[in-house]
Amino acid sequence: MAAAPLLLLLLLVPVPLLPLLAQGPGGALGNRHAVYWNSSNQHLRREGYTVQVNVNDYLDIYCPHYNSSGPGGGAEQYVLYMVNLSGYRTCNASQGSKRWECNRQHASHSPIKFSEKFQRYSAFSLGYEFHAGQEYYYISTPTHNLHWKCLRMKVFVCCASTSHSGEKPVPTLPQFTMGPNVKINVLEDFEGENPQVPKLEKSISGTSPKREHLPLAVGIAFFLMTLLAS
């Protein structure tokens, strides 16, 4: 029985608003991009690998994962950092900030996943904020002496719409807007003739022509009611 009021409410909601309700309180929906962070991913072993995202997109980082029969002490474990361009090129995390740690390589059922949302504003004081048109850099350092010591990735936040990014749009000037020190003489275009201005009708003493016939209409209505009652 509780589903009936909900169904009635959905029927009353205009169709254009349904996609907005499906987005939830966060606003615009973003796409998800997946990267498997391990030495077998050859893209991470070379400089220049770039993932392009839009504002409000998600980047899912999947840590190395092994089943119970996999290797023990030789399993890959990484600490991921967000660094600047110099730290990205030299694979130096000393000036970076620690983001995630992949240290549960034998997690049950599925690999550990970390997600980064490229949002313009963060609700947390220490949260990360991302801007359209900027590049961000991620590297990792292994906790064991592995052959592939440097895994790195570049993320480019592409140009999203203003509704996604939350940034105020730059106002576009109308075509008739002119620069400073330009005088516009509107009346000179009429060469002395008065422009045709529409005339506004105004009721006298606040009475409308329809109100003048009101007593007659009331009298006719009263006459018809009397005739029907007889």
Swiss-Prot record:
Q: Which Gene3D superfamilies match?
A: Cupredoxins - blue copper proteins
Q: In which tissues is it expressed?
A: Expressed in myogenic progenitor cells.
Q: Which residues form the Ephrin RBD domain?
A: 30-161
In this protein, the residues bearing a glycan are N38, N67, N84, N92
Q: Propeptide residues?
A: 207-230
**PROSITE patterns per the UniProt record, alphabetical:** EPHRIN_RBD_1, EPHRIN_RBD_2
Q: Does the keyword Ribosomal protein apply?
A: no
Q: Which GO terms describe its cellular component?
A: plasma membrane; side of membrane
Q: Which cysteines are joined by disulfide bonds?
A: C63-C102, C91-C150
List the keywords (alphabetical). Cell membrane, Disulfide bond, Glycoprotein, GPI-anchor, Lipoprotein, Membrane, Signal
Q: How does it sit in the membrane?
A: Lipid-anchor; GPI-anchor
**Which compartments does it reside in?**
Cell membrane
Gene Ontology biological process: ephrin receptor signaling pathway; negative regulation of angiogenesis; positive regulation of amyloid precursor protein catabolic process
Q: Which domain of life is it from?
A: Eukaryota
Lipid attachment points (GPI-anchor amidated glycine): G206
| First and last residue of the signal peptide | 1-22
- One short Pfam family name for this protein? Ephrin
A molecular function annotated in GO for this UniProt entry is: ephrin receptor binding
Q: What does this protein do?
A: Cell surface GPI-bound ligand for Eph receptors, a family of receptor tyrosine kinases which are crucial for migration, repulsion and adhesion during neuronal, vascular and epithelial development. Binds promiscuously Eph receptors residing on adjacent cells, leading to contact-dependent bidirectional signaling into neighboring cells. The signaling pathway downstream of the receptor is referred to as forward signaling while the signaling pathway downstream of the ephrin ligand is referred to as reverse signaling.
Would you identify the family this protein belongs to, as annotated?
A: Belongs to the ephrin family.
This protein's assembly is summarised as:
Interacts with EPHA8; activates EPHA8.
Name under which the protein is recorded:
Ephrin-A3
Q: Which organism is it from?
A: Mus musculus (Mouse)
The gene coding this protein: Efna3
